Amino acid sequence: LQFRGDLDHYYNKSQYTAMAICLYNLIPACKVCNQIKSKTDKKIQNPYDSSYSSKIRFKTEFDDQGDIDYLQGKSQNFNIVIDKTNILETDNNEIDLFELENRYNNLKRNAQEIIIKAKAYDVQYKKFLEDQFDIDGDELEKYIFGYTDEHIDRELSRFNKDIMEEFKEN
């Protein structure tokens, strides 16, 4: 097993010295997020906590009300926003602390690709692929759009699934 990312102490090692050497206290974090988190006492959720259930959902929003090209994947004239309906206080802390909306707006190209795939892989084409490869429809969607049920297992999994669900044909 090889891990190339940074690990962060969930419980501050200077305040909780016994937790400094505990492997269960280490959570994956990008270098920038690790530095940001170390400067605050705001409570965020531990992704390994058995009760972890982030309510954060991503969606797109018109940047220019007259431009609907983005709905077909033809432009990046949209914003990526976080639907804050029913979120927990710890979710809101994460959104604010890590400036998530600003960060995810740098992924418009990824969202645009998902929008195009959602249009290209219509119901008929997905049915064809399911038959050709003898694969379940849910599994096929996971392969096409790059997400897993356990979002912590794959980068951008939550983001990819949320954007896909916004644009897929049923």
Model-derived segments and their meaning:
Residues 1, 32-33:
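Short Cys/His-rich metal-coordination motifs, predominantly Zn2+-binding knuckles/fingers
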